[in-house]
Amino acid sequence: MKPTKMRNKMIYRASYQTKSKQLGSALSKDLQKKYGKRSVRVNEGDSVTILRGEFKGVDGKVAEVSTAKSSVAIEGVKKEKTKGDKFDVFIHTSNLLVTSLNTEDKWRIAKLEGKDPRKQPKEAPKAAEKPAKEEPKKETPKAEEKPAKEEPKETKVEKKSEEKEDEN
C-alpha cells in the first residue's frame, strides 16, 4: 500500500484524542517570543488570521472547534446558500496563524509558560473569601453504646445439622 494511503488511514481513523492533538496552529512572532513555542492547540476565543484559501487575510475569533472535522469555525467567516441562509465555513488549523490567545484557561497558560500547572496555587472562589461567622459546636452527649451481640446468627448449615439431630 502506498504511504499516502497509509497516512490518510491513520488520520481519518484516529481517535478524538489524537485528532485533538492535530488541531495545532502556528503562533505569531510576538507570541513565539513570549512563550518559546511555535505552535499551540487552537481553542474557542483565540484570535486568528487566515493565511491560505478563499478567506485569506481575514481576522476573527474562533467561534467553534470541531475535532470530528479537524477544523475551526471563525466569527465573520460565513457563506450564503441559494435560499439566503448563512452557514459557518470550517477552516483547517494548518491554514491559520494565532494572533492572541484566550487566557481564561489558567491551566493552558501555565503549560505554555513551561510551569507545572498542578503545582500552581488554586484561586479561591469569591464566595469563600468572606468567612461566615461560625458558632462553636456544642458537644451532644452520645447515647449509650449498644453492647456487642453475644449470640451470632445461626447459619443455614447449622440449622440443617440441628434438624438432622432432631430427626435422629
UniProtKB/Swiss-Prot annotation:
Domain of life according to the entry: Archaea
The record, for SUPFAM superfamilies, names: Translation proteins SH3-like domain (SSF50104)
Q: Which GO terms describe its molecular function?
A: RNA binding; rRNA binding; structural constituent of ribosome
Task: Cite the entry's keywords alphabetically.
Answer: Ribonucleoprotein, Ribosomal protein, RNA-binding, rRNA-binding
The processes (GO biological process) annotated in the record are: cytoplasmic translation; ribosomal large subunit biogenesis
Q: Where is this region: Disordered?
A: 112-168
Q: Which GO terms describe its cellular component?
A: cytosolic large ribosomal subunit
Q: Which PANTHER family match?
A: 60S RIBOSOMAL PROTEIN L26 FAMILY MEMBER
| Subunit and partners | Part of the 50S ribosomal subunit.
Q: What does this protein do?
A: One of two assembly initiator proteins, it binds directly to the 5'-end of the 23S rRNA, where it nucleates assembly of the 50S subunit.
Its family remark reads: Belongs to the universal ribosomal protein uL24 family.
Give the protein name, as stated in the record: Large ribosomal subunit protein uL24
Q: Which gene encodes it?
A: rpl24
